[in-house]
Amino acid sequence: VAASGQLKSIAVGLLKIANDLRWLGSGPRAGIGEITLPEVQPGSSIMPGKVNPVIAESVAMVSAQVIGNDTTIAIAGQSGNFELNVMMPVAAHNLLESIDLLSTSAVNFAHQCVNGLEATGKGPEMVMQGLTIGTALAPIIGYDVAAGIVHEASVSGENIREVALRMTDLTEEQLDEILEPLSMTEPKA
């Protein structure tokens, strides 16, 4: 039961990663589109020319099976009477199936999906055009003023930098330093 629980944890983690990659690769003209997934299987049954994220989808299916197997194993584990458990065969079968499915799926996911991921140009553009970058202004100009800038950018369609230039006394150079995304990834003392 414990081993199956660990396999389920791995399945949940792989499912999360696969779904994140599906979302980040959604597009080409609608969706997030920050990454390009390898084209493993051409075409889509609904949209001609679209490439489906079939490897990530296969990981999702395997994860669902492993999670289901864990439920069966948990029921089998609690079904024993004293020293006898007639459900050991189904527990063993599902445990071995989960091991096989996860190991095969993880290797396939790495080789046919993760190793072929490519970043698109959308990511940096989305950061600079996004509203979340406005959080970097709060320690400098105060929460309320920063919130006003974010709101104005949201309403006007301008980016945070343009609105901050107009609504504050900050210079272009100061804003370049404050709104540098990389500086937001490190803790400050």
Question: What label would you give each PLM region?
Answer:
Residues 1-35:
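Acidic, glycine-rich loop-and-beta core segments that form the ion-binding/anion-interacting portion
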Residues 19, 26-189:
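Catalytic-core signal marking the mid-to-C-terminal active-site face
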